[in-house]
């Protein structure tokens, strides 16, 4: 890390990786594959597959932890709110529609029903300049499944997933 900004992001959010760096030479999973890809994760942990992310989303919905929109509907923002930390989130500077109660930057005390504690990490463009994008109002983590992630020119963080298929909410693993 060469700059003070980069060092600050590392301290607050952890390392940002492009996909090849995150996978550490392993081949991304095919759609129906179920093996764990360790990549940059320590022993006992792996990069979650798209199926594991979908299982988490289904759990949030089925358990009633997702927030409800003004019209009574539940959408992907309702799932995000249940996974988002209760601090650091902001609304984008410009929005075309009225903010909904499901948005993570609205009524943040209602965020994090799951204790997942997702931080607004944004992402980084890796094509030369140190360009940090959408921090404070977006989050995303790599999937080990091919074809569902951002391009290799972007850097985002890795969310550790236990090989024991348990969720850890301890701040040490955030």
Feature names for model-found ranges:
Residues 1-174:
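Conserved positions within compact, well-structured domain cores
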């Amino acid at each position: 890390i060469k700059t003070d900004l980069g060092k600050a992001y590392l301290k607050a959010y952890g390392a940002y990786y492009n996909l090849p760096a995150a996978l550490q030479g392993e081949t991304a999973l095919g759609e129906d594959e179920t093996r764990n890809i360790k990549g940059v994760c320590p022993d006992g942990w792996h990069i979650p597959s798209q199926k594991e992310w979908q299982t988490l989303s289904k759990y949030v919905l089925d358990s009633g932890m997702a927030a409800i929109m003004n019209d009574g509907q539940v959408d992907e923002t309702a799932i995000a709110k249940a996974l988002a930390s209760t601090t650091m989130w902001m609304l984008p500077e410009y929005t075309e529609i009225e903010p909904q109660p499901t948005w993570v930057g609205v009524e943040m005390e209602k965020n994090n029903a799951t204790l997942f504690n997702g931080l607004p990490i944004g992402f980084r463009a890796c094509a030369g300049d140190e360009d940090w994008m959408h921090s404070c109002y977006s989050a995303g983590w790599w999937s080990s499944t091919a074809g569902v992630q951002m391009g290799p020119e972007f850097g985002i963080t890795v969310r550790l997933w236990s090989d024991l298929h348990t969720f850890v909410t301890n701040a040490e693993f955030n």
